[in-house]
A protein has these predicted regions:
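Beta-propeller-forming repeat regions
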Residues: 20-145
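Short hydrophobic alpha-helical membrane-anchoring segments
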Residues: 15-19
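Eukaryotic N-terminal low-complexity, Ser/Thr- and Lys/Arg-rich leader segments
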Residues: 1-2, 20
Length: 145
């Protein structure tokens, strides 16, 4: 019985490997991104950060601007150019979207790294989009957290 089970597993494994090698899981759509320059981007999240009813791809920029890409007339283009969001002097490597203040809209947490050890020069960001984009970490009551 064990021998038969082992044979079945080997056949199934070989079938999967063969099919996976020939499958096209991803498609290169980089041609539809407007102003698509070479850059380092290590993180992505999907949310409706600007509250327009459409999801944006929030793309981190490692020493490049963070982007909020959304479809406009068949192309992906950056919708947010505010300095506090773009933040190209920081080295952003991760992003997460979550409604932390329970207002029904997601905030963005940007993980920044500018050193491999020791104290960071630039802090992370926790951005909220109200009438303008603000960093909740920079509000006075949160400065010593």
């Amino acid at each position: 019985m064990l021998y038969i089970l082992n044979e079945i597993i080997c056949i199934f494994y070989n079938f999967l490997i063969t099919k996976m090698a020939s499958a096209e899981f991803f498609q290169d759509i980089s041609g539809i991104i407007k102003n698509n320059e070479e850059r380092l981007s290590y993180g992505i999240s999907v949310t409706d950060f600007n509250k327009d009813g459409q999801f944006e791809f929030i793309v981190t920029g490692f020493r490049h601007p963070n982007l909020a890409l959304s479809y406009k007339k068949g192309f992906l283009e950056n919708l947010i150019n505010e300095e506090i969001f773009s933040d190209d002097i920081r080295s952003t490597i991760g992003v997460a979207a979550c409604d932390i203040d329970n207002d029904g809209f997601e905030e963005l947490y940007f993980l920044n790294t500018d050193t491999y050890s020791g104290r960071k020069q630039y802090s992370d960001r926790l951005l909220d989009s109200q009438t303008k984009i603000i960093d909740l970490f920079e509000i006075e009551k949160n400065l010593n957290l």
